[in-house]
């Protein structure tokens, strides 16, 4: 999905102008810093120089603040306090943490309470109090300084409809406040259990909530920006945004959406949004806003990809993300769509910010741009930009006092992002007084301007990759629910399997399919127990024949060489891998499993086959027992029986598979694959 916009090399010459303007903003920012902000910057700069202090700080916020048990919380606090150094925390705080850590042995409750109070106090500029009086007062002060706020109601990830509804109501309540006129909302925070495989169904569900949200916005004059974090939410969020705003009720409404530059697909979706918004603008005269950010979910995206065996969705390096960001700026600030698409430049990197402003100026679209920053992260810089004539919108997370634990994840993420060596904010605390750090950031900026011309805009998640078999075992990757080919294939198979009526499943003995008179019903637990197949039930004679057959075959099977068994297991693994979507579809109807539940089970079964293939040499001197009876449970109808069958076969035994009566259709898939 490449970008539809070519880069403009003429803009490269604006880099020198941006650098000069950045120096001016830094000087002005230093003048505007009050005593409190200067002290905070010294404290943070000191903290960032000491990895142990960073680790201790993350422990304090991410663990001590979240744990309800005072005993456990105090124990973790003592561990963190031991890591507190004078280098990272300064003499007073460093010694104080050690002393309080010792005190927590005898007075855990007051110590933990004091820690909570201190963390809240230190974070009050980053996370605002959601209580009406406090928030209204803060908004008033910001407005007096020419700053505006984009409110984001923080909270834990929603797990069910009840939690989603509570969050939704808290957002609606915030929108009804007279002082609030701009709010950001993640669709995943107001609709629970979004299923990416069923993207149409998920879009329908979120669209219902969006209509309520937009009606409230129209009534109270609030601008709504759709936020997102997870890569999987990107296509759904963009599609829902366009669908609802195309409806007659909302076609004349202004609204916004975020795009994350650390995802290559952002370029494709930006092009899609531009083309759509121009048509919509021609119909109604209403514009949209695209908020360009670099991305704030990198660690989670990488962890999820590694866990499932996927290719990570984001760019691989910070320099690539920077190049992607300025390429988006190049594509965004253009006169041909300036009326239809407003652009939010959301970055604390003054080099990128000033370059964007120079690009807008050179193209005559300065009125198209909003500068956006994070509340509490760079107050003086925000004021300096405002005084230079460019209004600033501050992204402001809010939470109620009794829900502060939900804000801890935000704090940890901000800390994790800003402590990266390549991150501009880490350098920003000293950059104006440190020529070396300024030069480092200047060079990174110039590199991003140059590399924007060549940075790929093709998906990195969906790149073709093959698993080469080696002597080292590797897990089978889980199917990627964001992969269009997989979605299409599994959807097709589910429809095919759900159309099956009165399938008959035989016994298989000595390679012969046997349909007996005595049969049992196979039902669909997800469809009120509807009967969709019948399976044959063996008699005593059938059992005796099966045992005799397996005993006779045992000598031949155990006589195969290690390499011959290895080849058979590898072939079986390949067959199972190719039949993944079919197996998922059968399990969904036979065991009532969702795609997310069934797919890892198929991958686990493939792992069993490949594991025993790569470790077959360990069974070379084993003595087969003979015939092994595998009787699996119904709740893991594919992986467990495959694991049992493969283990027995690898040791030279023969196997009789007696499936759970509730999931015979799944067992029939296993037999077909093996």
Walk through the language-model features, giving the residues of each:
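Catalytic cores of nucleotide-enabled group-transfer and carboxylate-activating enzymes in metabolic
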Residues: 129-133, 143-149, 159, 219-224, ...
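Active-site-adjacent beta-strand anchor residues
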Residues: 227, 346, 536, 631, ...
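Extended hydrophobic-aromatic, low-complexity segments
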Residues: 343, 354-356, 424, 531-534, ...
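Active-site-adjacent "gating/activation" loops or surface patches in catalytic cores
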Residues: 200-204, 301, 515-527, 536, ...
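Rossmann-like NAD(P) dinucleotide-binding subdomain of oxidoreductase/dehydrogenase enzymes
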Residues: 588, 614-674
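Short, structured beta/alpha segment
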Residues: 426, 430-589, 611, 618
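Conserved hydrophobic/aromatic pocket- or pore-lining residues that grip, position, or stack substrates
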Residues: 151, 529, 565, 587, ...
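Positively charged, amphipathic and often flexible ligand-engagement surfaces
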Residues: 1-475
């Amino acid at each position: 999905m490449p970008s539809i916009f070519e880069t403009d090399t003429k803009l490269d010459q604006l880099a020198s102008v941006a650098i000069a303007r950045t120096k001016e903003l830094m000087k002005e920012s230093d003048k505007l810093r009050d005593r409190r902000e200067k002290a905070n910057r010294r404290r943070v700069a000191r903290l960032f120089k000491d990895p142990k202090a960073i680790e201790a700080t993350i422990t304090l916020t991410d663990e001590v603040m979240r744990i309800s048990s005072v005993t456990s919380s105090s124990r973790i606090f003592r561990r963190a306090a031991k890591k507190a150094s004078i280098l990272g925390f300064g003499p007073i705080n460093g010694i104080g943490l050690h002393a309080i850590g010792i005190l927590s042995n005898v007075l855990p409750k007051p110590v933990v309470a004091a820690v909570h109070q201190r963390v809240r106090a230190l974070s009050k500029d980053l996370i605002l109090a959601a209580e009406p009086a406090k928030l209204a007062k803060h908004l008033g002060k910001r407005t007096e300084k020419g700053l505006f706020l984009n409110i984001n109601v923080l909270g834990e990830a929603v797990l069910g409809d009840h939690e989603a509804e509570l969050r939704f109501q808290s957002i609606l309540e915030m929108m009804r406040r007279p002082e609030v006129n701009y709010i950001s909302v993640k669709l995943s925070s107001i609709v629970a259990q979004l299923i990416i495989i069923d993207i149409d169904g998920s879009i329908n569900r979120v669209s219902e909530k969006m209509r309520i949200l937009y009606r409230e916005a129209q009534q109270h004059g609030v601008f709504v920006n759709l936020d997102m974090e997870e890569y999987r939410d990107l296509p759904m969020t963009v599609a829902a945004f366009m669908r609802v705003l195309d409806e007659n009720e909302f076609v004349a409404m202004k609204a916004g959406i975020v795009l994350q530059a650390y995802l290559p697909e952002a370029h494709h979706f930006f092009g899609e949004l531009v083309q759509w918004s121009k048509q919509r603008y021609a119909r109604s005269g209403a514009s949209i806003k695209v908020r360009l950010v670099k991305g704030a979910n990198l660690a989670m995206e990488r962890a999820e990809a590694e866990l499932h065996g996927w290719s990570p969705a984001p760019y691989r390096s910070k320099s690539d993300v920077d190049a992607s960001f300025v390429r988006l700026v190049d594509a965004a600030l253009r006169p041909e769509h300036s009326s239809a698409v407003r652009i939010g430049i959301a970055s604390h990197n003054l080099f990128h910010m000033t370059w964007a402003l120079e690009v807008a100026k050179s193209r005559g679209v300065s009125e198209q741009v909003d500068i956006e920053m994070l509340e509490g992260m760079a107050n003086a810089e925000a004021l300096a930009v405002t005084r230079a004539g460019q209004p600033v919108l501050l992204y402001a997370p809010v939470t109620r006092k009794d829900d502060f634990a939900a804000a801890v994840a935000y704090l940890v993420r901000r800390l994790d992002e800003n402590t990266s060596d390549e991150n501009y904010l880490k350098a920003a605390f000293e950059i104006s007084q440190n020529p070396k750090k300024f030069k480092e950031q200047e060079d990174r900026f110039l590199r991003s301007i140059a590399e924007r011309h060549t940075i790929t805009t093709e998906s990195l998640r969906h790149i073709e990759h093959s698993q080469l078999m080696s002597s080292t075992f590797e897990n089978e990757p889980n199917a990627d629910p964001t992969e269009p080919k997989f979605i299409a294939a599994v959807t097709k198979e589910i429809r095919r399997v759900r159309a099956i009526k009165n399938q008959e499943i035989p016994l298989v003995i000595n390679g012969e399919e046997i349909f007996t008179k005595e049969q049992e019903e196979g039902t669909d637990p997800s469809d009120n127990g509807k009967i969709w197949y019948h399976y044959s039930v063996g008699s005593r004679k059938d059992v005796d024949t099966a045992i005799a057959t397996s005993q006779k075959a045992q000598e031949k099977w155990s006589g195969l060489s290690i390499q011959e068994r290895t080849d058979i297991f590898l072939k079986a693994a390949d067959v199972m891998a190719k039949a993944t979507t079919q197996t998922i579809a059968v399990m969904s109807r036979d065991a009532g499993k969702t795609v997310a539940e069934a797919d890892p089970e198929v991958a686990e079964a493939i792992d069993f086959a490949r594991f025993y293939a790569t470790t077959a040499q360990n069974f070379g001197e084993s003595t087969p027992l003979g015939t092994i009876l595998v009787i699996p449970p119904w709740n893991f109808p594919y992986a467990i029986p495959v694991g049992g069958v493969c283990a027995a076969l690898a040791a030279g035994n023969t196997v009789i598979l007696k499936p759970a009566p509730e999931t015979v259709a799944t067992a029939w898939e296993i037999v077909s694959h093996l």
